A protein has these predicted regions:
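A short helix-breaking turn/cap at a secondary-structure junction
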Residues: 7-71, 75, 94, 254-265
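Short glycine/serine-rich loop segments
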Residues: 7-25, 210-231
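Short, exposed "boundary/linker" segments that immediately precede the start
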Residues: 1-6
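Acyltransferase
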Residues: 65-92, 115-123, 147-168
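Short glycine-rich, flexible loops that bind phosphorylated cofactors or substrates
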Residues: 62, 179-180
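Short, well-ordered beta-strand elements
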Residues: 228-237, 244-245
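Short, surface-exposed loop/helix-turn segments at secondary-structure junctions
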Residues: 35-36, 101, 149, 181-203
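Short helix-loop capping/hinge segments that flank enzyme active sites or metal/cofactor-binding pockets
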Residues: 47-57, 105-162, 174, 178, ...
Length: 265
């Protein structure tokens, strides 16, 4: 309930399933500072005509992407055109490296609060994988001012994003910067020739929504040349969960996907 960065997620396969999950989980609770009641979402109205979609792409080149991801996502965005939405490219609304610095600071701080006891005890340290040890050690070295600076950036981004939602109902990013990679890899070491400086830099595309806890819905965009899948993040303003579910429902009705299978061997 008190995490600085959004990390809660659900793996429901469609908007209607997610709506049922939220009807069970969500709602006001005096023990939870951010809980709120939801309207009836059992029947989702999927009429999206007139909705404004902002496409952030690769954040003006700041996010390295493997070949084909942007093209597949941009082709998928045409579904919104068919639904009567307006899709526009959006210039980078904030310096991405600042968002990354804020996110990794708050994440390391959060991980350290959870794993410090294991890390500081030499008898249990090796129970943590190397990446967790690195992040815990990093978090333990942070000062109060480091966390404060990260929190200020987080607040500035929240304000900038809120202003952006005055022009757009939903912002869109790819769900990933890489196609699904071999199971033997722990994580991708480079993307499009750019070396990843941390074990989670390859997931930077999810930071803009996660850093400030915006509701985000992933929908399938399609398959690339190798038959591997990619999706779209549909990101809404704070409190727009129901509107985002309706957006996802409209997408699924216009672009049914459950019967599709990639041509892979």
């Amino acid at each position: 309930a008190y995490e600085m960065c959004g990390r809660d997620w659900s793996s429901d396969v469609c908007s209607s399933d997610l709506a049922m999950t939220l009807m069970v989980q969500a709602g006001h609770d005096p023990r939870q500072p951010h809980g709120r009641d939801l309207p009836d979402i059992e029947h989702l109205n999927a009429d999206l005509k007139g909705k404004r979609i902002g496409w952030l792409g690769d954040w003006g080149g700041a996010l390295p992407m493997e070949v084909g991801i942007l093209e597949t996502c941009e082709e998928a965005l045409k579904v919104f055109d068919d639904l009567g939405c307006t899709v526009e490219k959006v210039a980078p609304p904030f310096q991405l490296e600042l968002l990354w610095d804020s996110w990794i600071t708050l994440r390391s701080w959060s991980i350290a609060t959870s794993c410090a006891a294991l890390f500081l005890d030499e008898r249990t340290r090796d129970l943590l994988k190397p990446e967790a040890q690195w992040e815990t050690e990093r978090g333990l070295k942070l000062s109060a001012m480091d966390v404060h600076r990260a929190s200020v950036i987080r607040s500035r981004w929240f304000e900038a994003a809120a202003k952006l939602f005055d022009s757009y109902d939903v912002l869109v990013l790819p769900t990933a910067q890489v196609w699904p990679f071999p199971v033997e890899w722990t994580w991708p070491k480079e993307i499009a020739g750019m070396t990843m400086d941390t074990y989670h830099r390859w997931m930077e595309v999810v930071v803009p929504a996660g850093l400030i806890g915006l509701p985000c819905l992933a929908v399938p965009a399609g398959f690339g040349a190798a038959g591997l899948p990619i999706g779209l993040q549909l990101i809404g303003r704070r409190g727009s969960d129901v509107a985002l579910l309706r957006m996802g429902q409209g997408w699924h009705e216009a672009a049914p996907w459950a019967h599709l299978r990639p041509e892979v061997t």
